[in-house]
Amino acid sequence: MRKLIATVFNYSLDGLLADEGTEFWKFCFDLPENREPDDPAQLDFLQSAYAHIMGRTAYEGIAGSMTTSTDHPFADILNAGRKVVFSRTLKTADWANTTIAAGDTAEEIDKLRQGGDGHIVVWGGVSLWRSLMRLDLIDELRVSLF
């Protein structure tokens, strides 16, 4: 069974990640620590994922950053990787290799966990993390502080 691993790449001790009006995901992906990860294992972790899951808001922000990027180290991984968006309002997903999971969260996660290699990376957002935690579905939490 595949592990569900929630990642928090950008975390702040004071709770502030960006000023009001900042495009959050663009800000996150433009951080030097994310543009040039000092740990090759971070890229290996993302590359070896079976699927990358996210909520609608995170999907819209990440897709907006990664589909237009020509030089970000995460772009090739995410653009080619399998992505699943958890949303009951999103009707279409234009980002390649993306499906929408609109059913019961626990059942959708169970389907993703079945099978062989790789793990499932949870990118965000907060509503999805909360649902997954409330349902006790997260196997591991990886936090990076800058």
Task: Enumerate the predicted regions with their spans.
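Portal/gating segments that form or line small-molecule/metal binding sites
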Residues: 1-140, 145-146
